[in-house]
UniProtKB/Swiss-Prot annotation:
Family as reported in the entry's similarity comment: Belongs to the purine/pyrimidine phosphoribosyltransferase family.
Function: Catalyzes a salvage reaction resulting in the formation of AMP, that is energically less costly than de novo synthesis.
The protein's Enzyme Commission number: 2.4.2.7
Location in the cell: Cytoplasm
Enzyme class: transferase
Main location: cytoplasm
Name the UniProt record assigns to this protein: Adenine phosphoribosyltransferase
Length: 175
């Protein structure tokens, strides 16, 4: 039975800034069975892409990616905000739909040739995905797919990274 996950995603207007509609996944996370099913859907996608490792950007990418990695018996690599990792890092900057930031990964986090699937809660402008892809490739890995709970197609993230296979549970048009 297919689940319409959009029924369990809260839409919060003017958060974190006026004019933004924030898509809140916490109702899914609060329901153990829904969370398990959403995790399984993303894990099946990662399995189909023959992933060797899962990457999740801070912070909600940890919530989405860690259980996917666990279900598949794969390692998980966090892409962290600056100055959170204790060892030598690779860094890439990106723009968000409402700001800018950087991501870092330990230089030894991805092995050369590893097939990587990124998991996160939402793809909007693809800024986080683009920065993560840069990090993965700089470390010698290959981004073979990206899986999201939510995609905002009107922000044209797919168009910005046409070489990346993208999977999402829910798409919100006109958002």
């Amino acid at each position: 039975m297919a689940i319409d996950f959009s029924k369990y995603i809260a839409s919060v207007k003017d958060f974190p800034n006026k004019g933004i509609v924030f898509r809140d996944i916490t109702p899914i996370l609060q329901d153990g069975e829904l969370y398990r099913i959403a995790t399984h859907e993303l894990a099946e996608y990662a399995k189909s892409r023959k992933a060797d490792v899962i990457v999740g950007p801070e912070a909600r990418g940890f919530i989405v990616g860690c259980p996917v990695a666990t279900e598949l018996g794969l390692g998980f690599v966090p892409a962290r905000k600056p100055h959170k990792l204790p060892r030598e890092v690779e860094r890439a900057s990106y723009d968000l739909e409402y700001g800018s930031n950087s991501l870092e990964m330990h230089k030894d986090a991805i092995k050369p040739g590893q097939r990587v699937v990124l998991c996160d809660d939402l793809m909007a402008t693809a800024g986080t995905l683009r920065a993560s892809k840069e990090l993965i490739e700089n470390l010698g890995g290959k981004l073979v797919g990206a899986a999201f709970y939510i995609e905002l197609p009107d922000l044209k993230g797919r168009e910005k990274l046409p070489d990346v296979d993208i999977y999402s549970l829910v798409q919100y048009h006109g958002a």
